């Protein structure tokens, strides 16, 4: 059986939604930047890329119309390269990577790109209608289908007895680990600076806030 291997990785820094470093940067620009660098790091000819699969949970606004196809063109890949977008909500990027591997293992492709992109700052705005977003029958018969992540988190906390204090403690520990990793350059190799922003702008090194 054929095997799929990861030969390169690249990502952009992460910014806060609506007020962060990339709040006005299109998803195509972000994803295209990462794709371009990943292909370059892999030392492959862009013309040899068979497919680009990207996951995105909010495929509307600037992320509609096959964001994978738009992003690969933004990356400078030729029009002969196919693109496919996947929506599996929070697991969209993971599913895209798994699908990219499947394209090689089962479908005979040789080079694929898999990843995820999300720029909620440019998709959820005053024109994002939610009044008819839920199917009435599904909402009545299976209301859990439309649970938000915060509702899911509350359910998990109640079910498994996870206190708010313990979660806050773990969150702070995670933030401090991130700040430590940034200070020591542990993530430098995987981050591709974009417009001089090179680190994830989520933590303050001194406090972890």
Regions found by a protein language model. Give the residues of each.
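Short, well-ordered amphipathic alpha-helical segments that serve as non-catalytic structural scaffolds
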Residues: 27-42, 67-71, 96, 149-156, ...
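Single conserved hydrophobic/aromatic residue that forms the stacking wall/gate
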Residues: 201-209
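Phosphate/pyrophosphate-binding loops at sites that engage ATP/ADP/AMP, CoA/4′-phosphopantetheine
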Residues: 38-48, 160-161
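Condensing-enzyme catalytic core mediating Claisen C-C bond formation in acyl metabolism
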Residues: 1-27, 158
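Conserved catalytic cysteine-centered active-site region
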Residues: 56-110, 144-151
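N-terminal extracellular/periplasmic Venus flytrap/periplasmic-binding protein-like
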Residues: 11-13, 24-33, 166-202
């Amino acid at each position: 059986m054929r095997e799929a291997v990861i030969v390169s990785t690249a990502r952009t820094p992460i910014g806060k939604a609506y007020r962060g470093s990339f709040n006005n940067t299109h998803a195509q620009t972000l994803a295209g930047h990462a794709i371009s660098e990943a292909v370059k790091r892999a030392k492959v000819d862009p013309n040899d890329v068979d497919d680009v699969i990207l996951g995105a949970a909010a495929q509307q606004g600037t992320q509609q119309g096959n964001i994978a196809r738009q992003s690969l063109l933004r990356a400078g890949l030729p029009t002969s390269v196919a693109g496919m977008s996947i929506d599996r909500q929070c697991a969209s990027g993971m599913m895209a990577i798994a699908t990219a591997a499947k394209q090689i293992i089962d479908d005979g492709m040789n080079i694929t790109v898999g990843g995820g992109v999300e720029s909620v700052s440019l998709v959820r705005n005053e024109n994002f209608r939610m009044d008819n977003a839920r199917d009435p029958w599904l909402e009545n018969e299976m209301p859990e289908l439309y649970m938000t992540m915060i509702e899911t988190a509350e359910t998990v906390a109640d079910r498994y007895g996870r206190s708010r204090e313990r979660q806050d403690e773990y969150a702070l520990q995670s933030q401090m680990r991130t700040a430590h990793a940034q200070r020591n350059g542990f993530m430098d190799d995987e981050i591709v600076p974009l417009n001089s922003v090179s680190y994830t702008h989520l933590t303050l090194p001194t406090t972890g806030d």
